[in-house]
Structures are given as structure tokens and as C-alpha cells.
Amino acid sequence: MSVAVVLFTSDLRLHDNPVLRAALRDADEVVPLFVRDDAVHRAGFDAPNPLAFLADCLAALDAGLRHRGGRLIVRRGEAATEVRRVAEETGAARVHIAAGVSRYAARREQRIREALADSGRELHVHDAVVTALAPGRVVPTGGKDHFAVFTPYFRRWEAEGVRGTQTAPRTVRVPDGVASDPLPDRDCVENLSPGLARGGEEAGRKLVTSWLNGPMADYEDGHDDLAGDATSRLSPHLHFGTVSAAELVHRAREKGGLGGEAFVRQLAWRDFHHQVLADRPDASWSDYRPRHDRWRSDADEMHAWKSGLTGYPLVDAAMRQLAHEGWMHNRARMLAASFLTKTLYVDWREGARHFLDLLVDGDVANNQLNWQWVAGTGTDTRPNRVLNPVIQGKRFDARGDYVRGWVPELAEVEGSAIHEPWKLQGLDRAGLDYPDPVVDLAEARARFERARGLD
């Protein structure tokens, strides 16, 4: 009987998985394989939160495969070595994998291809599995390889259209006797954020249904409301591929309305960042547009930012949410990033690395390029805009409920005064166990403008 290997990466699902479907068409039996790559461990990208969420995802994937007569094979080691070993053990002629956009993904694909070629085997790479529209599917006129501005990209993205979706297979036949390492166990992962969400395809699909049938209708008006949190919280599931971006686009449009269209636009933003990184993989850690910044380094200020003790309540609330949940509202991410890179004038890479250490949805394309967008080294057409945490608080947390939820030291402060506690007088200020601001906003803005040559 013919055998094919399916190497699961960022597509840990059975529904609408073109990689799995292609392998099932290709062979009588398939080997669903996940490799815990040593290269990821060496690079320090196996932080506790994403590792625990991954454990949930793999357990759910294995359960789904067993329900269909198969099982998940897990190996630990170098990806290329383990893939070749499994192919040789099972006699598989071809390996199927979803296309990635990061430098790591490119190196992994190349090494697997070379390892398989030594024994006459092939690697098949499938587009539009991780994203709704494949990077490079649409390109600007004039010889450029990617769009640097979202609006023209979105017009072409909409005109191109998203691929159709596929159902989950009814059966999956796996060869007998294929050895597997144990599945990773969430309960064995230490130092988790206490409010970390659960992962897995079933959890993701339930969240999709709940989102589409209710909160999405208010997304256009409420997505920036920090306390209301009218967001989907689907980003971890998109990152690990337990839900399909293409399926989300179709289902959101079926529901329709302004909320659905606004949500689809955010999915297109995700694709936008992936097509940038696919063409500019160096932008994961190098400036997309160099500004020749001479970044500051202050250990005390960096500690205050990471710990949620800057003295600016909205920034501190955001950072405490990140520590507790391994997730943060997008508006809060923008503010926290602006405060670090423009108010404190610290290298965006320092903040991006901290986010990747904690975020359960730490997608390299979206995390790094959003950090660059805020820092003014990325694709933003207004690179020197500075977000004021007081103004942002009064606009997007007008009653202060988001701050009160994460900064209990300020729970008794009434109204918009919660965003400027340093202005409280007498006993009202003395009774607060909350730090003074680490920096004066006006002085920090002037420093940034001098550094960027704007004064």
C-alpha cells in the first residue's frame, strides 16, 4: 500500500486542512506527524504559555485522528532527520507540509527537501493553509514583490478571493507499528500564566461559533473598547492553526453586517503581515525601514514596563493582562509598544522578545511587524506618531473599568481620574500603593522628537 507523511506545523486541525486532504488523495495510508524540533528549543521559542497551548492542540488532534481510525505520531529531534526517518520506516514516497513565511520555516523546508532527496523522496509544500490568501498570491504592479501599504493590498486581497474550504476527513488510515514519543502534557509545563486559555481544535471551533453568533455583530463599534473586550480571542487558534483563516472569512461573510466585514478586514491584516515577512524574512529581527535609532537602555524602566509598574495605569493594566493571560487586547498591545519604543525610546526588539516569551498567539509575522509598525521602523505611513497613555485611556477605557480590573491599587479612584493618579491630592494620593510615573510624557516626547530629527 502507498504511504504519505503529513507533517503538521501551524495547521493543527482536521477541518479545512488542504495538507491532510492532499496526502489522503496521494496515498492509501498516511502518517500524521508532528516533530518537536530541537531548533525551536535552541532558539528559545518554546516558552511555557505557547508550549502548554500546543500540548492541548496536539492532544485534541490525536483524539480527532483516533476518532477517525488513526493517531498522531510525535517525534522529538531535528525536523529534517525525524521526517526522513519516518518516511524511511514507513516507505512513504512523499511528505506534505503547509508553507511557512519565517526564516525558520524556510530553513526547515529546505533541510527536509534535501534530506528526502537523498533517498528519492519528495516534499510537497501547500499554500494558503496558515493564511486565508497565500503570500505572493497578489503582488503590486511595478516589479515589487510585496505590498508595503495595507489599503491597496486589501483591495487586491478582496478582488482575488479566498479559496474554498474542505470538510474534515471521515477516516484516516495510519500504518501499523509506527513508533511515537508521548504527547506533551500541559500539566507538566511550569510557570504558566494563571489565566491561560485552553487550546485544541474543538475549543477553537466552539469559540468560532460563539463569536459568529453573537459578539461579532458589535465588532465594528466595540473592538477598541478595552473593558468591553469585543474581540474574538481567536488569535491563539489562528496561530496554531486549530481554526482555518479561510473558513473564518467565509463564515464571517455569511453572517454579514458591519461587524463581519470589520472582522474580515482584520484577517486580511494578518495576511498582509505574512506577505511582507515572506518577502522580507529579515524583518523578523531587522528594521524593515531603518530609522537609524540610537535606542536607550535603562534596566529599571524596562523592569517597570515588564512588571506593569510604570505609573501609567493603562500601560500597567495591559502588561499585567499579558502576564496573567498570555494574551492582550490589540489596542493595549499598541499602547504598550508605543510606550516602550517612543516614550521610553527602547529598541522594539526588546519588547517583541518579551511578548513572544508570554503571548500564546506569538506569531512571528504579526508580532514582529506590528511592533515595527508601532515603532516607526515598519510599514506604517505615520512612523513618528506617539500614543499618549492618558488620552488613550480616556478614549478607550472612559470609565476606567479595564484599569480597575488589572490594577486593583486604583480600584477606588473614581472616573477618568484613574488615568492620572499622580494628580490626586493629599490623602487620596498618599493612600495609593501605586508608583509615580517613570517618565514625564512631555519630556519623553521631546526626547523622541530630537532623536528622530523632528524638533
UniProtKB/Swiss-Prot annotation:
Domain of life of the organism encoding this protein: Bacteria
Site location (Electron transfer via tryptophanyl radical): W295, W348, W371
Reactions catalysed: cyclobutadipyrimidine (in DNA) = 2 pyrimidine residues (in DNA)
Entries under PANTHER family matching the protein: CRYPTOCHROME, CRYPTOCHROME CIRCADIAN CLOCK 5 ISOFORM X1
Assembly, per entry: Monomer.
Family, similarity comment: Belongs to the DNA photolyase class-1 family.
Protein name listed in UniProt: Deoxyribodipyrimidine photo-lyase
Chain positions recorded as DNA binding sites: Q392
One biological process term in Gene Ontology: response to light stimulus
GO MF annotation list: deoxyribodipyrimidine photo-lyase activity; DNA binding; FAD binding
Interaction with DNA as annotated region, ranges: 266-273, 330-331
Cofactor note: Binds 1 FAD per subunit. Binds 1 coenzyme F420 non-covalently per subunit.
Record's keyword annotation contains DNA repair: yes
Entry function: Involved in repair of UV radiation-induced DNA damage. Catalyzes the light-dependent monomerization (300-600 nm) of cyclobutyl pyrimidine dimers (in cis-syn configuration), which are formed between adjacent bases on the same DNA strand upon exposure to ultraviolet radiation.
Photolyase/cryptochrome alpha/beta domain: residues covered: 2-131
Lineage: Bacteria, Bacillati, Actinomycetota, Actinomycetes, Kitasatosporales
Organism annotation: Streptomyces griseus
Gene that encodes the chain: phr
Enzyme class: lyase
The protein's required cofactors: FAD; coenzyme F420-(gamma-Glu)n
Binding site for FAD: Y219, T231, S232, R233, L234, S235, D361, G362, D363
Keywords for the protein's UniProt record, in alphabetical order: Chromophore, DNA damage, DNA repair, DNA-binding, FAD, Flavoprotein, Lyase, Nucleotide-binding
